[in-house]
Amino acid sequence: MFCFRKPSDSDIKQYINDRREEQFAYSNLYGTQDYATKEEYEMDPKYSNFDVDQVKIQLGTGVECFQKAVAALKQWKHFDLDWVDFYFKNTPIAVGETVGILSKQVGFWILSFARINYLYDGDQEDGSIKFGYSYGTLKDHVEKGEERFVIEWVRDPDGAPDKGAVYYEMLSFSEPSYWLSQLGYPVTRYFQNKFVVDSCNQMLKAVGSNQNVRHV
């Protein structure tokens, strides 16, 4: 949704309430469960019309880092960016919850809506522990597609709680849903990449890391 003035919090709350029963606005629902890597998506003709993006960074090691990262995700720290307003940060990470993302890009306020459609929470078959979620776009989102946000702790084989890499992963597939998005495709891709970099840095900050991501 393109806006010439910044919507009020009450307007956004009403927009979200109006969309609680709205259907997802893209094909390949739950598609972010299909594969582990970007390369696998790019080999599947089903995703040939989508831009597929993936980044996976190490946040640190051990259970303490994992717990900090999970807490940050639950508080939506990965959206705590100076050019993005997230609505609303008291929203629990639960299937069916709808959220709004507002950003200012090239003179427009862009307001988008997405709904959480599945979760990761607990032990995985490979022995790792994951916490995270996926959300899919609703009508009026400038893109059509789905994105997953996952914290993963690859536990040490010997069970040492202070060992084992902790990762933050984002994977998405998307395509423009408006002619303005298509016309401004390079700008859209710029902001998508900027979001990935800034989100990674917020998660690194949340776990107390001194690392910094400059590009992906």
From Swiss-Prot:
Cross-referenced Pfam families, in alphabetical order? DUF1990
**Known InterPro entries for this protein?**
DUF1990
What organism is the protein native to? Dictyostelium discoideum
> Family, per the entry?
Belongs to the UPF0548 family.
Origin superkingdom: Eukaryota
Instruction: Name it.
Output: UPF0548 protein
